[in-house]
Swiss-Prot record:
Gene Ontology molecular function: any one: rRNA binding
Region of interest called Disordered, as start-end residue ranges on this chain: 155-177
Gene Ontology biological process terms in this record: cytoplasmic translation
Family designation: Belongs to the universal ribosomal protein uL6 family.
Transmembrane segments: none
Ranges in a coiled coil: none
This protein's GO CC annotations: cytosolic large ribosomal subunit
Protein name: Large ribosomal subunit protein uL6
InterPro entries: Ribosomal_uL6-like (IPR000702), Ribosomal_uL6-like_a/b-dom_sf (IPR036789), Ribosomal_uL6_a/b-dom (IPR020040), Ribosomal_uL6_bac-type (IPR019906), Ribosomal_uL6_CS (IPR002358)
Encoding gene (name): rplF
């Protein structure tokens, strides 16, 4: 039994939701999103509350039950408040700068890395060592943050690289004589 899936989803104020078969649409102050729920899961819409139930008690249906509920809740949070991820850049000479809509990263390579920002996501660089990624789609914001971090992951000896703002790097001790 999914403990996450059992909880009903209340629609926040300022957000309108429609359910058409397996398609859930949400429209709010930040924009509009939709999510196609898996066929194994049944969606019911009653008076500002959406409930999600598995069609049968198979293991496959129950495994998709909680995920579907979380995805629907994420689209409501996204169109109301949006999502934001912060990245920090550590290292001598490591920096980021906006170049039009793209982001230019100096990460210690012989060339600068230019990352093309997809539509639906906005990237700002308040400081050369900080990147703020925001948008209404949680998956897309996280994907952009992961792709930028992947160019130079933080290394464990000095902590140089791109890391999430709330991430702790496990530091190792260097060689001993």
């Amino acid at each position: 039994m999914s403990r996450i899936g059992k909880r009903p989803i209340s629609i926040p104020s300022g957000v309108t939701a429609t359910v058409e078969g397996q398609l859930v649409k949400a429209k709010g102050p930040k924009g509009e999103l939709s999510y196609v729920v898996n066929d194994e899961v049944l969606v019911k819409f009653e008076e500002n509350v959406i409930s999600v139930m598995p069609r049968d008690q198979s293991k496959d249906a129950r495994s998709k039950w909680g995920m579907s509920r979380s995805m629907i809740e994420n689209i409501f949070c996204g169109v109301k408040d949006g999502f934001e991820k912060r990245l920090e850049i550590n290292g001598v000479g490591y920096r980021a700068a906006l170049q039009g809509k793209d982001i230019q990263l100096s990460l210690g390579f012989s060339h600068d890395v230019v990352y093309k920002v997809p539509s639906g996501v906005t990237v700002t660089v308040p400081k050369p060592t900080e990147i703020v990624i925001s948008g209404i789609d949680k998956q897309q914001v996280g994907q952009v943050a992961a792709e930028i971090r992947e160019y130079r992951r933080p290394e464990p000896y000095k902590g140089k690289g791109v890391k999430h703002a709330d991430e702790r790097i496990f530091r190792k001790e260097g060689k001993k004589k």
